Amino acid sequence: AVMDEQGQPLPAGAQGEICLRGPKVTPGYWKDPQRTGASFFGDWFRTGDIGLLDEEGFLYLTDRKKDMIISGGENIASSEVERVLYQLPQVAEAAAIGLPDERWGERVTAVVVLRPGALLTLEQIRAHCEGKLGGFKTPKEVIAVEALPRNPSGKVLKRVLREELSR
């Protein structure tokens, strides 16, 4: 099932947290009732993945909940922003993260690794993104780095980026 923040099922096409239940789903965390309680809506296990069901019942994974950017009360899937950033020929690698913003809660920030010799400005990124994303999803800031932090299996560590760039 795909559920809202209150644990209510969402209709087809609506994005929410993917929840599971069944005989093979964990009963909880070993000797950690607080974490177990936070991980369930009743008997539905909260996966931490964001997705949606289409009209035919097919499930689409769109993001991780902890990677969701919340700006001005709007949920923004970082993966959606990244797909658009990767369309730019100057971009070798990209990550979209939310950084603290006094007015909006979080601001969409693009962290990019440019191809050798490439140049890219915030204005160029915004112009590219505005036609493909809603205005509130368009990056408000671009930070160029030499490399994105990764775990041993190659996954980008967005938590590390948020910590380092929030200072």
Language model features with spans:
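Structured core elements
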Residues: 1-2, 19, 60, 95
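A structural signal for short hydrophobic beta-strand segments in well-ordered beta-sheet cores
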Residues: 2, 49-53, 96
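Conserved ATP-binding/catalytic segment of the ANL
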Residues: 8-13, 17-79, 84-87, 103-104
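Conserved C-terminal "lid"/linker of ANL adenylate-forming enzymes
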Residues: 69, 95-101, 106-116, 122-167
